[in-house]
């Protein structure tokens, strides 16, 4: 089969005649014939900083089940269309992949493979970041799309907890607790915005102004331009100095600093998707930071260097297995929409050059996807 192989730090190569993987008995794995794949920032970061020569790259894929281990106890069947994340070491950028069946999501009949491929990493990342006990530990959404967040009992501002410009003018409506999403127009950010709304919270977005329409269409009640001087102070004012939760999908010193500035006087929780800045961390003892690394959802040790190394976390695996089933229902009902996608040409052969677009920050508000079948 064809596959995109890591050949060294920062380099990928389309390789022919790579052995087709197979499902080992008792592994609880499945074999997927890949129809489409999507790019993530983790793809270039892994090959640049943690390259494993000979390993197949990629995490996001969508395809058709070709084989299922007999020990699997699930509703999956050969021929099902599925989407998901592959493994700790990647492997999605290939014509076939073996992965964990318990972490896959069935694709609705009305969705194509290109849009389906955009979900995987974002689903498990937001599931862990929003609902994991070490992360924001928020209330989960119900499978019918109704929120379960405990309402704030006392109104703080004239229109509710956080000013509520986009919520209601009705003083009888129960206000929602605000949650800040920095990098709201990323693929993970738009999923987080939707899940927060579905969970009963008020999503507040930070992104570029040209993406305000996108994040508002996904449920953001208020948008802030991160370029604006005093953006953190404006968010603090909007939330009446009581913001407690922030998810940082970008994770730089400046993004972390803005989130810390926005969090209210009583402190709160900050979750990053990359290692965070220690100097900013020390600026506020009342804010509890946590680096959420989504690869822990496989329940296995992560043998990487530095802050990326993690011991096995079986509790994250259990959370992921539970959450993908909720996400599957929400996607099926049209309550959890895919991030905008941009179909690139060349199939697997176009991946190496397109990853450089992510590396250089040339992609905004869309996710790059590639057809595998038919190329």
Curated annotation (Swiss-Prot):
Entry domain remark: BOA5 is composed of an enoyl reductase (ER) domain and presumably acts in concert with the polyketide synthase BOA6 that misses an ER domain.
Chain segments carrying region Disordered: 1-21, 147-168
InterPro entries attached to this UniProt entry: ADH-like_N, GroES-like_sf, NAD(P)-bd_dom_sf, PKS_ER, Trans-enoyl_RdTase-like
Subunit structure: Monomer.
EC number(s) reported in the record: 1.-.-.-
Keyword Transmembrane helix among record annotations: no
Source organism superkingdom: Eukaryota
Protein induction: Expression of the botcinic acid clusters genes BOA1-13 and BOA17 is coregulated by BCG1 during both in vitro and in planta growth.
Origin organism lineage: Eukaryota, Fungi, Dikarya, Ascomycota, Pezizomycotina
Keywords: NADP, Nucleotide-binding, Oxidoreductase, Virulence
Protein name per Swiss-Prot or TrEMBL: Trans-enoyl reductase BOA5
GO molecular function: nucleotide binding; oxidoreductase activity, acting on NAD(P)H
Coiled coil (UniProt feature): none
Function recorded in the entry: Trans-enoyl reductase; part of the gene cluster A that mediates the biosynthesis of botcinic acid and its botcinin derivatives, acetate-derived polyketides that contribute to virulence when combined with the sesquiterpene botrydial. Botcinic acid and its derivatives have been shown to induce chlorosis and necrosis during host plant infection, but also have antifungal activities. Two polyketide synthases, BOA6 and BOA9, are involved in the biosynthesis of botcinins.
Binding residue positions for substrate: 121-128, 294-298
Source species: Botryotinia fuckeliana (strain B05.10) (Noble rot fungus)
Family, similarity comment: Belongs to the zinc-containing alcohol dehydrogenase family.
Compositionally skewed regions (Polar residues) per UniProt: 1-16
Pathway: Polyketide biosynthesis
Annotated NADP(+) binding sites: 42-45, 185-188, 208-211, 226, 273-274, 363-364
SMART domains to which the protein is assigned, alphabetical: PKS_ER
